[in-house]
Amino acid sequence: MLKAYKYRIYPNSGQRIQIAKTFGCCRFVYNQTLAYRREIYGKEKKSVSKTDCNNYCNRELKKDYEWLKEIDKFALTNAIYNMDAAYQKFFKEHAGYPKFKSKHDNHKSYTTNFTNGNIAVDFETGKIKLPKLKAVKARLHREYSGQIKSATVSQVSSGKYYVSILVETEHKELAHTNHNIGIDLGIKDLCITSDGKVYENLKIIKKYEKQLVKLQRQLSHKGKRSKNYYKTKKKIALCHEKIRNIRKDYLHKVSHEIISENQVIVSENLQIKNMVKNHHLAKAISDVSWYELTRQLEYKAKWNGRKYIKIDTFYASSQLCSVCGYQNPDTKDLSVRTWICPKCGAEHDRDINAAKNILTEGLRQIA
């Protein structure tokens, strides 16, 4: 199994210069090979493979631009492979057509491959050995065992540097459990389960969102490209990063608990891209991070021998009585939070009842 371990690194001035060079050269090669691919297709209507692009880089670009030879060759090759992956996504998944990369992008990264011990993590000295950088000081808060496959060096908008070490390792599955659960994703709360547990949205994020609004207001009054403008911009980036990290950490804790305690997990397959088109709900939907939660549940279920099922978006989970199956049209009104079934008299909390119906439908599909 492949697992990634992310660590913050603290490069010295020379290493920062080399990292910046690598970012720039990878961006340059990405853009040049993308332009080459477009040109060949425009002239000859001929598809160009990633191998052709790599050969073009080695034979033409490195000959014309000598400074490319100062950069780790695997980083340049992976930049070409990333460009090819964007092309494949465009054709297979109907994603947007690949765009040229800008030096003003907030997130910069490059990936290098392991070969002949060129990447190594020393937990005793707290340093990571990387190609062209030698030993870089790092905060190694988690140990791992296994074979290193690659390393991705990145710099986020706040200016911090990170390295993600991809490792081939063994994963011990969680013990089997007989408990199953349905999950109703919400806006007021993150999610509600079929056994009545409510996972609330984090209130502390509101505190940082208020700080963010204040900083953005301050930024609007700063002179563009002034020192204070860039200082405030960095504070905004740090605030965004804080919110993102708090939210992701919470989602990991929630998903770990759900996966640990249940064998079958069922949720709705919500079309989030379509839902955020509703401008009244877009921010609320983005804030609760449904996509990230379901993504974590999906891969953690695979790791641990669990079954994660997504039922149809249009399944009437909120309208059905989970006891007798009666469909109550009155519950189409979202303001109806509790109701009594006219057929069997069962009392329902809207969200818990929906979660029970989601579980029933999921179990029916795998029966």
Residues covered by each model-derived region:
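Gly/serine-rich nucleotide phosphate-binding loop at the start of the catalytic core
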Residues: 1-76
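Well-ordered beta-strand positions in beta-sheet-rich domains
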Residues: 4-8, 150, 180
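Generic detection of short hydrophobic beta-strand segments and adjacent strand-loop junctions
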Residues: 7-9, 135-138, 199-201
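Non-catalytic, well-ordered alpha-helical scaffold segments
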Residues: 17-20, 24-27, 74-81, 252, ...
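Stable alpha-helical structural segments in soluble proteins, enriched in small hydrophobic residues
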Residues: 33, 79-90, 352-362, 366
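Long, hydrophobic, amphipathic alpha-helical segments used as structural scaffolds
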Residues: 34, 38-41, 87, 91-98, ...
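Acidic carboxylate diad motif detector
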Residues: 52-156
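Positively charged, helix-rich recognition surfaces that bind polyanionic ligands
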Residues: 142-147, 157-367
